[in-house]
C-alpha cells in the first residue's frame, strides 16, 4: 500500500503558497488583488 501524498507541513505550505511569495512576482500580486476584489477572508496560505 502506498503512503498518503498529503503530508501537512505549515512551513512548507507558507513557503510555496504564502503571502510573501505571492507578492514577489507580478502574477502573484495579480492573484492577491483578484482575491481582494472577490472579498476572500484568506488571501494566501
From Swiss-Prot:
The keyword Cell inner membrane does not apply. It comes from Salinispora tropica (strain ATCC BAA-916 / DSM 44818 / JCM 13857 / NBRC 105044 / CNB-440). It comes from the Bacteria. GO terms for biological process: translation. Keywords: Ribonucleoprotein, Ribosomal protein. Gene3D superfamilies: 1.10.287.3980. GO terms for cellular component: ribonucleoprotein complex; ribosome. Belongs to the bacterial ribosomal protein bL34 family. HAMAP family: Ribosomal_bL34. Coiled coil: none annotated. The keyword Ribosomal protein applies. It holds the Pfam family Ribosomal_L34. GO terms for molecular function: structural constituent of ribosome. This is Large ribosomal subunit protein bL34. Transmembrane segments: none annotated.
Amino acid at each position: 500500500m502506498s503512503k498518503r501524498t498529503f503530508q501537512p507541513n505549515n512551513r512548507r505550505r507558507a513557503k510555496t503558497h504564502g503571502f510573501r511569495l505571492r507578492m514577489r512576482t507580478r502574477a502573484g500580486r495579480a492573484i492577491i488583488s483578484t482575491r481582494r476584489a472577490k472579498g476572500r477572508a484568506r488571501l494566501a496560505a
